[in-house]
Amino acid sequence: MKIQHVLIAASLVALSGLAQAQVDPLHVRSWAASCAACHGTDGRAQPGMISLAGVPKEVTIQKMLDYKAGRMPAATIMHQLSKGYSDEQISAIAGYFAAQKN
């Protein structure tokens, strides 16, 4: 009986990791679309705004987490927007923009 519980627990851990690794690309695109008003379609911004296309994933993740934690100035709406995403969503959005050509 004890072995059965261990096997079930191990299976659940393995499956949860798999579920986290596979984020639906359509969800990621819809999350990233909320950035288009300021940062342009696919992260290619108009002059005067920061482009996100091609920015390394780690850089975008860190900035978003800094906004979310209140470590960045509140001069924009980013501190509010970033709180609406989980860390996993932020990582997925950052990966999406990193993959875009600038």
Annotated model-derived regions:
Residues 83-102:
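C-terminal capping alpha-helices of c-type cytochrome domains
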Residues 28, 42-71, 80-85:
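Gly/Gly-Pro-rich "capping" loops immediately C-terminal to redox-active cysteine motifs
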Residues 1-8:
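Bacterial N-terminal signal peptides that target proteins for export
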Residues 33-41, 93:
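The canonical Cys-X-X-Cys-His
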Residues 13-32, 48-50, 66, 101:
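Electrostatic cytochrome c docking/interface patches
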Residues 44, 73, 100-102:
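Inter-heme linker and motif-flanking segments adjacent to c-type heme-binding CXXCH motifs
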